[in-house]
């Protein structure tokens, strides 16, 4: 592929890669015009810490343990690690490369294949959906953090009006059990519920009733609306957004400094909780329950689907933060090392978080004299705000301290993730409108985020959270990630992409990356997405089905996100006609003049490098079929010839 728009003065050069110094043509295209220099990270460590803070987040401590438990326990680690190496790492590295190579955000990088610009806008839509409910989780976390400073944890005892309540205090739990009360094992919703011997009245733990009746004031039917926002949660939501704005207001200059704390502090707390958890009675049973493999689950396609969903959720690929962070790197930054560190650390943290959480749940089962730990595990929001508080309230020594540490850790993890997501949206807007002040865009989007989050702090908010996460987050991000990979590797071309990497990183791309990007990663993602669509079932909240109107709204949400891809593609074609529609379509699938490194000097060297590569391949061309075959194999495998 010979590049035009910026040509070496003599048409060729004997220099190579970054060392090329030939003068370029005096005529400048749009791609060469001076642009405002992009702010860079203070140092490479800030970038690494920022990536850790977004990838090592709530998904590791909150979502991974239950996902693993639901999908084969220890056996889930096998498909998860396979998915990590065949999908997670390749997608993570690819997004890092795209961001650093172009120094552009999620939308602007699509100068590589302009007809695919809708992928960037669709990912922005999915990111907005995730931001909208993620901030409400921070509000819940802040609420529990604040009330943990009381002399007695408020969820550890029953209110007078709760006639079906059992205190979460350790001794009183035992007293109730000894008088003939047994734990119900009917559904995930009743994880802490206890049923009397005559089973005429279901009893629930005070931690569950506190969350449902005091904190979220849960509605079991949203057909008549979701209700009004709770003022306490609204205040907590406001505080969360103030913190988010303060972190992102100066771009990477402020978020880069905060990243050290956001990335490292959770590990301090996690290790403190781990040490405390493994010393609790019953912890061993909980850990074994988490790690014990259910080998039969490996043949279940749903397990592999959940491994992919968890990998995407945990690493934050497909939604833009990795591209955005990498776009603020220096062009020659060593991202290969960072990609390997973050993806490996993410997996180890998930395992560490799972061991810690199930050690605590094992202690909870021990205190309740329950043999099957399955009965104390709850999915979704309930795991963080019912099971964990219930277990912490039974700590014999200073439960308030461990409660404060735990919820502060969750808050920091959540801030690290949402800061990256919010910065992605701000970067997209600032890339599009160069003259706009970053802090003003950050303030405006933060206000919008707060207003969107109000619906989630209503009595029916958990219903909306489940709906938006399912339709607007998971599936929108997943399908657009497939188009993202296809656009870069199949449309722009694997060889072109690998040449760009070689120029930027000064190293050939190994066979592992080439095989994953061109075959394993896209094929696995397509198969899993099709399977997910074929086997999709109506979603439920707390064992209750959503109203039909809610499901229609959910599918509409998915359609809006997915439709960004074709609609923006058609928009580009209509704005750049090339005579016939077919010619316009073909032109939209070729790189625009703006594709390439943002720095004009580096761009000129890159054009020389690419033209040299094209010339080398032309001279190596063999007319025989066998020679042609071996040349293609050599190029695919990364041969230096």
UniProtKB/Swiss-Prot annotation:
Residues 1-40 are cytoplasmic. In larvae, weak specific expression in the anterior midgut just proximal to the gastric caeca reproductive rudiments, common ureters of the Malpighian tubules, and distal swollen portion of the anterior pair of Malpighian tubules. Expression is also seen in the imaginal disks of the head; brain hemispheres and the ventral ganglion. Stronger expression in the posterior midgut. GO terms for cellular component: membrane; plasma membrane. Coiled coil: none annotated. The keyword Ion transport applies. The chain crosses the membrane at residues 41-61, 74-94, 111-131, 229-249, 258-278, 307-327, 341-361, 401-421, 447-467, 474-494, 516-536, 552-572. Its main location: membrane. InterPro entries: Na/ntran_symport, SNS_sf. Keywords: Amino-acid transport, Glycoprotein, Ion transport, Membrane, Sodium, Sodium transport, Symport, Transmembrane, Transmembrane helix, Transport. GO terms for molecular function: amino acid:monoatomic cation symporter activity; amino acid:sodium symporter activity; D-amino acid transmembrane transporter activity; L-amino acid transmembrane transporter activity; neurotransmitter transmembrane transporter activity; neutral L-amino acid transmembrane transporter activity. Residues 27-36 have a biased composition (Basic and acidic residues). Glycans are attached at residues 185, 190. Unusual broad substrate spectrum amino acid:sodium cotransporter that promotes absorption of the D isomers of essential amino acids. Neutral amino acids are the preferred substrates, especially methionine and phenylalanine. NCBIfam families: Na_transp. Belongs to the sodium:neurotransmitter symporter (SNF) (TC 2.A.22) family. This is Sodium-dependent nutrient amino acid transporter 1. The gene is NAAT1.
């Amino acid at each position: 592929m010979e590049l035009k728009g910026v040509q070496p003065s003599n048409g060729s050069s004997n220099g190579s890669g970054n060392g090329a110094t030939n003068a370029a043509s005096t005529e400048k295209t749009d791609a060469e015009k001076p642009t405002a220099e992009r702010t860079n990270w203070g140092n490479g460590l800030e970038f690494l810490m920022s990536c850790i803070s977004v990838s090592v987040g709530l998904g590791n401590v909150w979502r991974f343990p239950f996902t693993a438990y639901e999908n084969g326990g220890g056996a889930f680690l096998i498909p998860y690690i396979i998915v990590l190496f065949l999908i997670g790492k390749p997608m993570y590295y690819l997004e890092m490369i795209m961001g650093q190579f172009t120094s552009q955000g999620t939308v602007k990088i699509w100068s590589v294949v302009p007809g695919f610009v809708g992928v960037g806008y669709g990912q922005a839509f999915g990111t907005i959906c995730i931001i909208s409910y993620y901030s409400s989780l921070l509000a819940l976390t802040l609420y529990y953090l604040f009330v943990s400073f009381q002399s007695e944890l408020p969820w550890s005892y029953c209110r007078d009006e709760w006639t079906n309540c059992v205190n979460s205090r350790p001794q009183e739990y035992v007293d109730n059990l000894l008088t003939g009360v047994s734990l119900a094992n009917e559904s995930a919703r009743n994880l802490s519920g206890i049923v009397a011997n005559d089973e005429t009245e279901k009893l629930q733990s005070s931690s569950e009733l506190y969350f449902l009746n005091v904190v979220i004031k849960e509605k079991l039917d949203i057909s008549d609306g979701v209700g009004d926002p709770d003022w306490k949660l609204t205040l907590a939501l406001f505080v969360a957004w103030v913190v988010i704005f303060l972190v992102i207001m100066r771009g990477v200059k402020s978020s880069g400094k905060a990243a050290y704390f956001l990335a490292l502090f959770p590990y301090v707390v996690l290790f403190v909780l781990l040490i405390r958890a493994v010393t609790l009675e019953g912890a061993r049973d909980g850990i074994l329950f988490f790690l014990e493999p259910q080998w039969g689950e490996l043949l279940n396609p749903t397990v592999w689907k959940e491994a992919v969903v968890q990998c995407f959720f945990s690493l934050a690929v497909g939604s833009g933060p990795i591209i955005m962070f990498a776009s603020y790197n220096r062009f020659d930054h060593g991202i290969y090392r960072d990609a390997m560190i973050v993806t490996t650390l993410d997996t180890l943290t998930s395992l560490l978080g799972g061991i810690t959480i199930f050690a605590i749940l094992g202690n909870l089962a021990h205190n309740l004299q329950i043999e099957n730990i399955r009965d104390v595990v709850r999915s979704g929001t309930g795991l963080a705000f019912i099971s964990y508080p219930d277990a912490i309230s039974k700590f014999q020594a200073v439960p308030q301290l461990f409660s404060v540490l735990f919820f502060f850790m969750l808050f920091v993890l959540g801030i690290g993730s949402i800061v990256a997501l919010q910065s992605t949206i701000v970067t997209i807007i600032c890339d599009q409108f160069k003259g706009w002040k970053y802090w003003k865009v950050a303030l405006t989007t933060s206000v919008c985020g707060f207003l969107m989050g109000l619906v989630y702090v209503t009595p029916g908010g958990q219903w909306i959270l489940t709906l938006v996460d399912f339709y607007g987050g998971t599936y929108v991000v997943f399908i657009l990630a497939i188009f993202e990979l296809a656009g870069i590797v199949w449309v722009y071309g694997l060889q072109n992409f690998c040449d760009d990497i070689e120029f930027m990183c000064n190293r050939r791309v190994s066979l592992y990356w080439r095989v994953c990007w061109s075959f394993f990663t896209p094929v696995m993602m397509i198969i899993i997405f099709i399977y997910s669509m074929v086997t999709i079932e109506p979603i439920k909240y707390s064992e209750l089905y959503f109203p039909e109107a809610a499901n229609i709204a959910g599918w509409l949400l998915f359609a809006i996100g997915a439709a960004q891809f074709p609609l923006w593609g058609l928009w580009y074609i209509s704005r750049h006609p090339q005579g016939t529609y077919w010619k316009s379509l073909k032109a939209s699938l070729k790189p625009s003049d703006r594709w390439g490194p943002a720095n004009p000097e580096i761009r000129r060297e890159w054009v020389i490098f690419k033209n040299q590569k094209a010339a080398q391949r032309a001279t190596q061309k063999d007319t025989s079929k066998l020679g042609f075959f071996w040349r293609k194999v050599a190029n695919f495998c990364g041969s230096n010839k």
